[in-house]
Amino acid sequence: MENIQKLIARYPLVADLVALKETTWFNPGATSLAQGLPYVGLTEQDVNAAHDRLARFAPYLAKAFPETAAAGGMIESDMVAIPAMQKRLEKEYGQTIDGEMLLKKDSHLAISGSIKARGGIYEVLTHAEKLALEAGLLTTDDDYSVLLSPGFKQFFSRYSIAVGSTGNLGLSIGIMSACIGFKVTVHMSADARAWKKAKLRRHGVTVVEYEDDYGVAVEQGRKAAQADPNCFFIDDENSRTLFLGYAVAGQRLKAQFAQQGRVVDASHPLFVYLPCGVGGGPGGVAFGLKLAFGDNVHCFFAEPTHSPCMLLGVYTGLHDAISVQDIGIDNLTAADGLAVGRASGFVGRAMERLLDGLYTLDDQTMYDMLGWLAQEEGIRLEPSALAGMAGPQRICAAAAYPQKLGFGQALLDNATHLVWATGGGMVPEDEMEQYLAKGR
């Protein structure tokens, strides 16, 4: 306890985190893209290479997953305005939200119904391509739908993939790996939902369950993979490949904005609110958004009050050297996808200059907003996907933040607030009814 007091003396906001108070932190260390980019260690060329790789796999995906055929084998989600929800939030919180609120529906992405369909599937495809190229079975000029042939399935069955997950990443990696022909093991933490485990098993995935939290599942997955030279471990805490899979979202979103005639420039700022677990998904997306929109996009991460790992790590500068358990927080939350006690050190250090802020919200707030969104817009999400929904109201309530940016009222009226809905499209009906019953 003495150490916690010392930490609070240096970093006063830690007291609010320990007290499980809903907290908003605006990052005093935020810089321009030009200043912050070198610290990421990845470039626009890396993201373009990821984009090209996904394009090579598009013919394969279109055939392997017919639900992607209409989009030509591209796994991408809709972006919709949510005016009724915006009004409801204003009414519930008594706070005007300047500008327009939009929802990015990664919750309804093809194949696995969450943001993890971006990074998880991309990393599995990257590994498959590498193995096939090295074996001389494929060239980058080939039509990749050839990978559906029995010969390729047999080739990939000699290799295995392992991952540790709270649920959604395991779902995307498990389904994709099994489809390609890999043997795959998903190490699931205690908070993983039963339906996600059942779905994986139906796809022929080996699911190993733990009574412990996310960190233990990842560690055990890593250890198991080390014992087998043909096993590839997908490291959610440190993977640059996963990160790049998420980053591709930036250019695609820019194209969606153009299609819808929406402007993002110095007088039309874009604020984006991303739920954060270990950090790979929101970190990668935020990186891609910064490359696409430059200094006109402002990214915020949202975490449960019981799992504020990235806020704790970035705010103190301790990153992965501190966990929420170190300050007496239990890491137990209904937002299973965000139940992470120790943030990715890679993402925290890469992105700490490119984040405008982080905030926390409690489980009940997520349940309330889950219910309101279903009532007002007819859109059903899982609890973690609502974490971003509290963002616009937090930003609009904080006078000092727009002042610091030099944003007057006219600029705020032109703002777009994009809430990134991370999952929920595949939640079974009975489970969704239970979620809806918990909202007020």
Curated annotation (Swiss-Prot):
Cysteines engaged in disulfide bonds, as pairs: none
Entry keywords, A to Z: Lyase, Pyridoxal phosphate
Domain of life: Bacteria
Any GO MF annotation of the entry: D-serine ammonia-lyase activity
Record-linked InterPro entries: D_Ser_am_lyase, Ser/Thr_Dehydratase, Ser/Thr_deHydtase_PyrdxlP-BS, TrpB-like_PALP, TrpB-like_PALP_sf
UniProt key word tRNA-binding: no
Cofactor(s) needed by this chain: pyridoxal 5'-phosphate
Modified positions (N6-(pyridoxal phosphate)lysine) in chain numbering: 116
Transmembrane segments: none
Keyword Signal: no
EC number: 4.3.1.18
Pfam families: PALP
Catalytic activity, reaction form: D-serine = pyruvate + NH4(+)
One BP annotation, GO: isoleucine biosynthetic process
Family membership noted in the UniProt record: Belongs to the serine/threonine dehydratase family. DsdA subfamily.
HAMAP family for this protein: D_Ser_dehydrat
Assembly, per entry: Monomer.
Cross-referenced NCBIfam families: D_Ser_am_lyase (TIGR02035), PRK02991.1 (NF002823)
Protein name: D-serine dehydratase
Organism of origin: Salmonella arizonae (strain ATCC BAA-731 / CDC346-86 / RSK2980)
